[in-house]
Amino acid sequence: MNTPLPPGLAQIWVDADACPAVIRDILFRAAQRTGIPVTLVANHFLRTPTLAHVRALQVPGGPDAADDAIAERVNAGDLVVTQDIPLAARVLERGAAAVSPRGEPFSSDSIAERLSVRGFLEELRGAGVATGGPPALHARDRQAFAAQLDRWLARQSARS
């Protein structure tokens, strides 16, 4: 569903190219329960449930296309779900909140360090050092994500 959303209404943006299905399911349930709009952004087709508050935005392929689409559309007060540290930095600058699918909140206090670590790991990979990927998503990660989402939703309820 791609109906326009009312201006000024906080919403959740999902960098869906790498968002685990179990996290998307948590977001779908939250949208159904609370009426908060959830927009999944990806450079490929995404099957979404037919819920009034859930929509998918497919962007052209290419590096950072989904990230750019989110960064251009996000507003202060929105929540962005991403594991992409540069995207998290961009949305924090716009006054939005950002959280990883593991429930790790990004903050203006920690983002510079995270960008630095990311840059260092990229240098290692460029030099041929195997740095490995992220560990598998565990139940504790899902619980941490759900807890962060509930905190953000509670703040939205307090504002309205």
Swiss-Prot record:
Q: Which CDD domains match?
A: PIN_YqxD-like
Instruction: Say which domain of life the source belongs to.
Output: Bacteria
Q: Which Pfam families match?
A: DUF188 (PF02639)
Q: Which InterPro entries match?
A: UPF0178
Q: Which family does it belong to?
A: Belongs to the UPF0178 family.
Query: What is the designated name of this protein?
Result: UPF0178 protein XCC2288
Origin species, per record, is Xanthomonas campestris pv. campestris (strain ATCC 33913 / DSM 3586 / NCPPB 528 / LMG 568 / P 25)
